[in-house]
Amino acid sequence: SEMCIRDRSITDNMFLGREIRQKGFMGSFLKFLDKKAMADEARKRLSDLGLLTIQNINQLVETLSGGQRQGVAVARATSFGTKVVIMDEPTAALGVKESRRVLELIGEVRSRGIPIILISHNMPHVFEVADRIHIHRLGTRLCVIDPKKHEMSDAVAYMTGAKPVSYTH
C-alpha cells in the first residue's frame, strides 16, 4: 500500500493535514500556506533522518525511488509527536540497497525512543531489527520470541505449524 500521495511534492506529503499557514491576515483569513516554512521544516526532518539525498524538496513523490518514498513516509510519521510507528511490509518490492536504507531508518527511529511495530514476512529483516517477535498464524498470536535467544528457523517453524507452540517465550 502506498504511504505517500504520488502526484504531490515531498513537502506536501510531509504536511498532509498539518500545513503551516502564513502569519497574519493572509494565513488566518485567506488560509494561505507558508510554503517556505513548510519546505524548511520538511528539509530539516529529512535531514534529521539522514535522507537529504533528495535534490529538490518540492519534487513530486512519484519521481522518487521506493526507498526514498518510504523515507518520506517515515519522516512524516515521526515529525508530529508520534508515539508509535506502524510499518506494514516496508521493504516489500524494494531492492537490496533500498531495503538496507529502510532498515537503517528503523534503527534511527528506534534510537529516538519511538517504538515501531513492524509487520513483515521477511525473517532476516525482522531478526535484524526486532527486540521481540510476535508470531501469528491465521489471525491468532501463537507466541512471542526473543530474536537473540531463538533461531530464524524456529520462528518459521512456529509460523508454518512445523513446530508446535506449547508456551510463550
Short names for language-model regions:
Residues 1-2, 6-167:
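Glycine-rich phosphate-binding loops of nucleotide-dependent enzymes
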